[in-house]
Regions:
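Short, flexible/disordered intra-domain loops and linkers
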Residues: 53-59
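Short strand-turn motif at the edge of the Rossmann-like AdoMet-binding core
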Residues: 49
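Short, surface-exposed alpha-helical segments at coil->helix boundaries
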Residues: 59-62, 169
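Active-site regions of metal-assisted phosphoester/phosphodiester hydrolases
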Residues: 1-43, 52, 67-68, 72-75, ...
Length: 234
C-alpha cells in the first residue's frame, strides 16, 4: 500500500485453496504458490488450508506458503484434532501486529473468523477472513456471530472470504447494507457449481476500486482479486 497525497493503494486476494487440490484431482503446493504469487497481492486471505493432514501429504501448508511467498502470516484452525489442523490463513506483506480468532460453529465442521491488524507505516488496517458453512441452517447461526465481530471493527477494515452464498441471498443482503461489496468486473462464478460465493467488502469510503476473478485450475474455487484506493483521512 502506497501513500501519495494521503491516498492508499492495496491489492487484496481471497482464495479457497481446497488444500491445494486442483480440478485434476491432484494436490500440488508448488503450483498453488505460483498461482498466489502471480496475483502480486499485498494481502491474501486463504480458506481450506491444511496442516499435517494425510490428504495433503502431512505438509504444513500454512508455514510452507508463508515461507515460499515471503509474507507475514497468521492462522486460525477451524478444525483441530491432535496435530491435524484445517482452517483460514492471512498472508501479508506488512507486519501483523495483532490477531484474533473467533469460532462461529458449524454442524458439519467448525468454522472460524481470523482477524489481523496490519501495520503500514504509521497507519494500520484490519483484515477479517472467514469461511461460512455450506448449508443455509449453518449460516443462519453463523452470520449473527460474524455481524457482531464486524460491528466492532474500526475503519479502515476489509472482510474477505468464502461466504458460500451469492449476493441475492437474504443473509448477504444484510452484509451489503452495511459494508461495500467490491463488484467483479468480469462477472463469472468464483466456484463453478455454486456461483459467485467468494467476496471482498470494505467499511471505508473508496476512491477507486476494481475486482476480478483470476482463471485457475489449482483449486475448485478461483482467486478473487481487488485493487483498492482510499484516503487516509477516511
Amino acid at each position: 500500500m502506497n501513500s501519495v497525497d494521503a491516498i492508499f493503494k492495496m491489492r487484496v486476494m481471497t482464495y479457497n485453496i481446497r488444500h491445494g487440490k486442483g480440478m485434476d484431482g491432484q494436490t500440488n503446493l508448488r503450483r498453488l504458490v505460483e498461482e498466489i504469487a502471480k496475483a502480486n497481492a499485498d494481502v491474501v486471505t486463504l480458506q481450506g488450508v491444511d496442516r499435517f493432514l494425510p490428504r495433503s501429504g502431512f505438509q504444513d501448508q500454512f508455514k510452507k506458503l508463508a515461507k515460499q511467498l515471503r509474507m507475514h502470516s497468521c492462522f486460525s484452525p477451524s478444525v483441530n484434532l491432535l496435530i491435524f489442523q484445517y482452517g483460514n490463513a492471512i498472508l501479508s506483506r506488512y507486519p501483523i501486529i495483532s490477531k484474533e480468532i473467533k469460532y462461529i460453529g458449524g454442524s458439519i465442521e467448525r468454522r472460524s473468523t481470523l482477524t489481523a491488524r496490519l501495520q503500514i507505516g504509521e497507519e494500520s488496517v484490519t483484515v477479517l477472513n472467514t469461511h461460512l458453512g455450506v448449508h443455509t441452517k449453518e449460516r443462519m447461526k453463523q452470520v449473527p456471530i460474524l455481524w457482531d465481530a464486524l460491528n466492532k471493527l474500526e475503519r479502515p477494515a476489509i472482510i474477505a472470504g468464502d461466504f458460500n452464498m451469492e449476493m441475492d441471498d437474504p443473509l448477504m443482503k444484510q452484509l451489503n447494507s452495511r459494508w461495500q461489496k467490491i463488484e467483479l468486473q468480469n462477472k463469472r462464478p468464483t466456484e463453478e457449481k455454486s456461483g459467485e460465493i467468494d467476496h471482498i467488502f470494505v467499511n471505508m469510503p473508496i476512491e477507486q476500486a476494481s475486482a476480478w476473478v483470476q482463471p485457475s485450475a489449482v483449486s475448485d474455487h478461483y482467486p478473487v482479486i481487488a485493487e483498492l484506493r482510499w484516503r487516509l483521512d477516511n
